[in-house]
UniProtKB/Swiss-Prot annotation:
Identification of the protein by name: Large ribosomal subunit protein uL1
CDD domains documented for this protein: Ribosomal_L1
Example GO biological process: translation
Any one of the GO CC terms: large ribosomal subunit
Originating species: Acaryochloris marina (strain MBIC 11017)
Origin superkingdom: Bacteria
Subunit (UniProt): Part of the 50S ribosomal subunit.
Keyword Ribonucleoprotein included in the entry's annotation: yes
Length: 236
């Protein structure tokens, strides 16, 4: 059955040409086509030349978006002893020890990110089947397993986010809000591109970047010229 395309989407798609846009031009168009009745996010969809079924071709890391995400992140922390107070004082929204693990087992999921101290990971592993499918399982590589709770909480509150390539080698990531200026979105997108290049999996072969599209949550996909983005120097 063919999915019906709304009149609004048909009209928006007519504004997008079938070509790869210069990065800033693409983001200006993203902002222009964000016409939904709610605050839309800016999304990037990146196809990479990797096969994540092989461990040396997996990508999971974090990026610090210089202009932030535009949304409040609720952070939960699993710790014990003095680290509980440390996390609370640093601004964590939910803090607990074994009792928080039990609450998660019982269905508590009122947070966007879970940070754990290394000594609590054996307990956190008990709820791995619950956290894993939701992308919430703490990981040292993602910076969510650490004893330095104040720094981790500050960074994630300020706009650091975790992302990964899915099973088909595509990265789907929100890199701001459509209400941001195109220039601010460009700074965030450039930071994302730099991070993906710096964390290229050791087993990646051939052309690494296959395609890059951006869109507002309810907007049309806009192709971005990858070479132009990678060559861009925003420090000039």
């Amino acid at each position: 059955m063919t999915k019906k395309v709304s009149r609004r989407m048909r009209e928006l798609k007519q504004q997008v040409e079938d070509r790869a846009y210069e990065p800033l031009e693409a983001l200006e168009l993203l902002c222009k086509t964000a016409t939904a009745k709610f605050p839309e996010s800016a999304e990037a969809h990146i196809r990479l030349g990797i096969d994540p079924k092989y461990t040396d071709q997996q990508l999971r890391t974090t990026v610090a978006l210089p202009k932030g995400t535009g949304q409040e992140v609720r952070i939960a922390v699993v710790a014990r002893g003095e680290k509980v107070k440390e996390a609370t004082d640093a601004g964590a929204d939910v803090v607990g020890s074994e009792e928080l693990i039990t609450e998660i087992q019982q269905g508590r999921m009122d947070f966007d990110l879970l940070i754990a101290t290394p000594d609590m990971m054996p307990q956190v592993a008990k709820v791995g089947r619950i956290l894993g499918p939701r992308g919430l399982m703490p990981s040292p590589k993602a910076g969510t397993v650490t004893f330095d709770l104040p720094q981790a909480i500050e960074e994630f509150k300020a706009g650091k986010l975790e992302f990964r390539a899915d099973r088909t080698g595509i990265v789907h990531v929100m890199f701001g809000k459509a209400k941001f200026s195109a220039q601010d979105l460009l700074e965030n997108l450039k930071a994302l591109q730099d991070t993906i290049d710096r964390n290229r999996p050791s087993g990646a072969k051939g052309r690494y970047w296959r395609s890059l599209y951006v869109s507002a949550t309810m907007g049309p996909s806009i192709e971005v010229d990858i070479s132009s983005l990678r060559d861009l120097n925003l420090t000039d």
